[in-house]
C-alpha cells in the first residue's frame, strides 16, 4: 500500500472512514488480491478433479488433487504474508473503529444528558408555576374581606337587587356584624 505517514488524527484522514460491508469487501480485495486468487485456483482444481473423476481419468484426478493442495498452500501463504504486511494498518483501523464507537457512545450520552436537562428545566418551571399559583390562591384567601364583598355587591344593578331576597339580606347583616 502507499507509504503515507501515520495520521495524527484518524478522523481527518479520508482513508479511515466508516464503510459498508460491500465497501469493506472491495477494500480487502484490493489490499490482498492473492487470497481470492488462491481461493479461485483451489475451487478450479476441485472442479477439474470432479470432472476427471466423473470421466474416470484417475491420473488427471490425482494431478488436480495435488494442484488443489498447492493452491491451498498458496492461499495460506498469502493470508500469512498479507497479515504480516498489513499488521500496522489493521491496528490503526481497529483504533479508528474504537474511536468511532466511543464517539457514538459519547454522542448518545450527551443527547441523553441534554434530554435530562430539558426535562429538569420543564419540571422546575412547572414547580415554580405551581408554587406561584398556590401562593396566589393563599393570598386571595387572606385578602377576602368585606370591602371586596361590597365591591362585588355594587356591581349588581339596582333592578337585580330586589331579587336577592330576605334570607340573603339577613346573612349579609350578620356577616357585617361579625
UniProtKB/Swiss-Prot annotation:
Family (UniProt) = Belongs to the RCF1 family.
Q: Where is this region: Disordered?
A: 136-157
UniProt main location, coarse? mitochondrion
Q: Briefly, what is this protein's role?
A: Cytochrome c oxidase subunit which plays a role in assembly of respiratory supercomplexes.
One Pfam family this chain carries?
A: HIG_1_N
Report keywords, A-Z. Membrane, Mitochondrion, Transmembrane, Transmembrane helix
Recite the lineage of the species: Eukaryota, Fungi, Dikarya, Ascomycota, Pezizomycotina
Q: Which organism is it from?
A: Aspergillus clavatus (strain ATCC 1007 / CBS 513.65 / DSM 816 / NCTC 3887 / NRRL 1 / QM 1276 / 107)
Q: Which residues form the HIG1 domain?
A: 6-97
Q: Which residues cross the membrane?
A: 33-49, 69-86
Q: How does it assemble?
A: Associates with the respiratory chain complex III/complex IV supercomplex.
Gene Ontology biological-process entries? mitochondrial respirasome assembly
* Its membrane topology: Multi-pass membrane protein
**Name this protein carries in UniProt:** Respiratory supercomplex factor 1, mitochondrial
Q: Where in the cell is it found?
A: Mitochondrion membrane
Compositionally skewed regions (Basic and acidic residues) per UniProt: 136-151
Q: Which PROSITE patterns match?
A: HIG1
Q: Which InterPro entries match?
A: Hypoxia_induced_domain (IPR007667), RCF1 (IPR050355)
Keyword Transmembrane helix recorded: yes
Any one of the GO CC terms: mitochondrial membrane
Amino acid at each position: 500500500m502507499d507509504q503515507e505517514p501515520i495520521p495524527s488524527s484518524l478522523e481527518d484522514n479520508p482513508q479511515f472512514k466508516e464503510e459498508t460491508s460491500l465497501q469493506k469487501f472491495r477494500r480487502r480485495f484490493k489490499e490482498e488480491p492473492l487470497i481470492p486468487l488462491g481461493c479461485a485456483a483451489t475451487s478450479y482444481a476441485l472442479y477439474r478433479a470432479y470432472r476427471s473423476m466423473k470421466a474416470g481419468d484417475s491420473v488427471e484426478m490425482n494431478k488436480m488433487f495435488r494442484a488443489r493442495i498447492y493452491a491451498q498452500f498458496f492461499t495460506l501463504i498469502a493470508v500469512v504474508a498479507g497479515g504480516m504486511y498489513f499488521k500496522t494498518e489493521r491496528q490503526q483501523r481497529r483504533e479508528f473503529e474504537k474511536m468511532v464507537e466511543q464517539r457514538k457512545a459519547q454522542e448518545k450520552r450527551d443527547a441523553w444528558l441534554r434530554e435530562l436537562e430539558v426535562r429538569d428545566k420543564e419540571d422546575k418551571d412547572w414547580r415554580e408555576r405551581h408554587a406561584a399559583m398556590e401562593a396566589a390562591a393563599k393570598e386571595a384567601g387572606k385578602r377576602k374581606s368585606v370591602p371586596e364583598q361590597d365591591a362585588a355587591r355594587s356591581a349588581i344593578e339596582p333592578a337585580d337587587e330586589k331579587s336577592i331576597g330576605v334570607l340573603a339580606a339577613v346573612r349579609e347583616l350578620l356577616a357585617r356584624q361579625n
